[in-house]
Amino acid sequence: LDTSILSTDVARLTKLGATVVIPATQVGDVTWFAVLADPQGNAFSLFSRSTSERFEERVEVGEDYIVQAAAKPARGSMAWFEVGTTDHKATQSFYTRAFGWRFEFDDTAGGKQYYNIFTGKEWPSGGMYDLGADGADYLIPSFLVGDVPEVNELAESLGAVVEFGPDTNPDGLVYSRILDPNGNRFTVFSTPGM
């Protein structure tokens, strides 16, 4: 397995302010990965491509899922990601320089300081929420659901805490942020007409 690309990316990202949480680590004959944290402390992972047959099988399944999710995400699937930040300028600068992401203010968010994140396609695949100095920094997955209040009740019955929501944007999108019993944050959302 060639780790030179992964090592180059880790070195480049640390020069931009990221810190290494888990150094480059081999996963059998499948791949190498590293876990870094952005300047706000949010963890993210990098993976290297491999010529391993098992890696190619996993990539094929993953890419099929991404194509399906991009066309029409299924309920319960990860359909978005969100970066919550106490310093939107620093966060935007890091991810723009690190990965070439583009940020555009979301006029449909009802006056919230929310930016759509474009990771290379014409449609956004995530968002950045400027929470101000009193907020909390996070980088979390967002799952598409049919009924946000119902999912909130279920999550609470299983020991989770609904940190925020449900709230509704002017365009009808309903969302909540949840902290599971193990301390993992995620959001759930539904869209109009589901």
Regions found by a protein language model. Give the residues of each.
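N-terminal beta-strand motif that seeds the catalytic metal site of vicinal oxygen chelate
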Residues: T3, F47-S93, W101-E104, Y138-F143, ...
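Core segments of cupin and vicinal oxygen chelate
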Residues: K15, V27-T31, E82-P124, E150, ...
